[in-house]
């Protein structure tokens, strides 16, 4: 796995069918601020399907701490790092989600790139150096690139 930090807008980078977007959300799927709000603006189905997705997550994915979706031919993996939108994630909750992401990726060899913001580091206030180390350790078996965007 190669991790590259890129200054620029996550959504300005060319997306291909072998890419996935990854970002953090709460299990209530509020998505009302930060990068989650930008995702919900770019993919309006997040808003219209919020109750359905939150219910589906609670029934099928809550142990995994991720919720993968396909919207407009775009693969998005939501890392569920906290229960409610006003909570803050911990390094432990992020680690659990990253481990689930690693399992998810091991079953999808067609994924060549992960496009993500500095997860957990905006409104959630985790330290990027620590998060970066967690990503590198947890996704070391991923045979592709992790592109992390910052402004």
Predicted regions and their residues:
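Macrodomain-like recognition of ADP-ribose-binding/processing modules
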Residues: 1-151
């Amino acid at each position: 796995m190669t991790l590259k930090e890129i200054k620029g807008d996550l959504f300005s980078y060319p997306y291909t069918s072998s890419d996935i977007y990854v970002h953090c959300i709460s299990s209530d799927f509020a998505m009302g601020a930060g990068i989650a709000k930008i995702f919900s603006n770019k993919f309006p189905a997040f808003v219209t399907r919020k109750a359905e997705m939150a219910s589906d997550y609670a029934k099928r994915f809550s142990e995994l701490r991720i919720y993968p979706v396909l919207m407009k031919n775009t693969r998005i993996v939501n890392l569920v790092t906290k229960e409610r939108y006003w909570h803050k994630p911990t390094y432990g909750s992020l680690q659990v989600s990253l481990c689930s992401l690693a399992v998810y990726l091991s079953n999808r060899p067609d994924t060549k790139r992960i496009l993500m913001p500095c997860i957990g580091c905006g409104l959630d206030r985790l330290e990027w150096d620590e998060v970066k180390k967690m990503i590198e350790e947890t996704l070391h078996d991923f045979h592709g690139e992790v592109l992390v965007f910052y402004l």
